Each structure stands twice: as C-alpha cells, then as structure tokens.
Amino acid sequence: MKMMNGEDANDQMIKESFFITHGNPILTVEDTHPLRPFFETWREKIFSKKPKAILIISGHWETVKPTVNAVHINDTIHDFDDYPAAMYQFKYPAPGEPELARKVEEILKKSGFETAETDQKRGLDHGAWVPLMLMYPEADIPVCQLSVQPHLDGTYHYNLGRALAPLKNDGVLIIGSGSATHPLDETPHYFDGVAPWAAAFDSWLRKALINGRFEEVNIYESKAPNWKLAHPFPEHFYPLHVVLGAAGEKWKAELIHSSWDHGTLCHGSYKFTSA
C-alpha cells in the first residue's frame, strides 16, 4: 500500500516502542556518564530507522489531564537547579508537530480520555531533550511531548498507551522517558555495588517485562518488592506503562541498557517489539 507521498506504508510503520531511563542531566557535560554511549550510539546500535515524528512521554511533566504540547518549535526547558552554567546554554530546537498533537488529543478523547487537551506553549523538559539531544543531535525530527497523571495508576497509563498504539503505523516513534528506579534524593547511596533493595526491584521488573507479564507491572504496588523505595512517587515509572500499552499485542521485550548511579538509581531501558 502506498501513502499519498509515495512512501510504502509498511516502510513507514514502526513496530518498536521504547522505555528509556533519561538519567541525571549532568550527563550532558559528563563524558564518562554510563548513559552517554547508550544514547550516542542509539541510531547505530538500537534503532536505525528515522521516524516521521517522535511522541515522548516524560516523567517531568505532571498534569491533572493528559496533555500534549502543540507548538511549531520546541523551547528547551532547563528544569534543574545548581548545575554547571554550561548546561543552561544547551538548546534542542526540534520542530513540534501541531497536527500530531491534535491527533493525539482526538485519539485519546475517542478512547475514553475525554479531558485530553493540548498545550500551545510548553517546550521539552530535560526528560525529553537531554536524551534526544544525544540520540538525534540534528534536531530535525518533529517532537511532541505527552504528560503523565501521577494521581492515577499504572493501568490508567497502560490504557493511555493502548489508545496511542496506532500512531506507530504512521511512523511515529513512541518513547517513554523515566527511570527504572527513582528513589528520593535523601535515600542513602550504596557504594559497594548495588543496594540490595534496588537490585531486587530491578530483577523483578526485568523478569516481568522479558516474560511479558505486563499485568504485574500495571499493579506493581501489590507485586514488586521494595516498590516504595524504588518509586516513592510514580511519575518516573508511568512512562513505562504508557509504552507497554503502546507496544500493542504479542510484544517481545528486550533489555537494551543497564547501568547504575550511586547504587540506587537504575538506568534500565527496554525495547518492545510488536508481532
């Protein structure tokens, strides 16, 4: 089947969706950060296809209603404090895609998310632009960002993702950007390897995803060990639930990166490929 632009629909279609841990924004200036080579070799080792657009769900945009930004050029939001001055000079001027934003809003409303709306001003927070700046440094792919609703649960976000899954048929790459674990800042660092509580949670999550047990991940509060330490607040976990829904039916999960910061912050990242 040919698209109106002459492109074959099967060539445009994307079967993959991704959950990435975006890490500490210091990685923008810290060459030795373990996430840098992962992001910098993204197109070479992880996903070589150039998407028509990117829809990224960041744990740093929390709203009451599901909201997608609808701008022509994305501003770069420096939503962090007390970092080196050079970090506040970074710009990632990726184009927006208002048409995609309106389509996301329409799809969500038709799927039961009646309060979905667009935001005509918001740019990209560091959960979006920091990894994208390294993954797609040319900033030539249109990007829309979708918010999370931390007062709701994992199943809600999974269903949100299910509604958005057809966007992949149009060449939209769906990325959830959060963290495999995201403990409180005051959680003690663990300098002798990985904290046992964090290792147990990571092991549970990895096995659940690799074995396709998404239902357990949706109700992680009753299934996961040490979840209150791993995710005392859920905003960095919910991008994963959205991506699980967007993965569609009969998906296969693959761990594409794993490293740690301070023995407690897990950089686990996953690819989900639909059948």
Curated annotation (Swiss-Prot):
Cofactor binding comment, as recorded: Binds 1 zinc ion per subunit.
UniProt keyword Metal-binding, yes or no: yes
Keyword tags: Dioxygenase, Metal-binding, Oxidoreductase, Zinc
Principal EC category: oxidoreductase
Pfam families listed in its UniProt record: LigB (PF02900)
Family the UniProt entry places it in: Belongs to the DODA-type extradiol aromatic ring-opening dioxygenase family.
InterPro entries: Extradiol_dOase_DODA, Xdiol_dOase_suB
Catalytic activities: L-dopa + O2 = 4-(L-alanin-3-yl)-2-hydroxy-cis,cis-muconate 6-semialdehyde + H(+)
Protein's job: Opens the cyclic ring of dihydroxy-phenylalanine (DOPA) between carbons 4 and 5, thus producing an unstable seco-DOPA that rearranges nonenzymatically to betalamic acid.
A single MF term (Gene Ontology): zinc ion binding
Annotated transmembrane regions: none
EC number annotated for this UniProt entry: 1.13.11.29
Name of the protein in question: 4,5-DOPA dioxygenase extradiol 1
Cofactor(s) needed: Zn(2+)
Pathway: Pigment biosynthesis; betalain biosynthesis
Residues reported in the UniProt entry to bind Zn(2+): H22, H60, H182, H236
Organism lineage: Eukaryota, Viridiplantae, Streptophyta, Embryophyta, Tracheophyta
Organism: Beta vulgaris (Sugar beet)
Top-rank taxon: Eukaryota
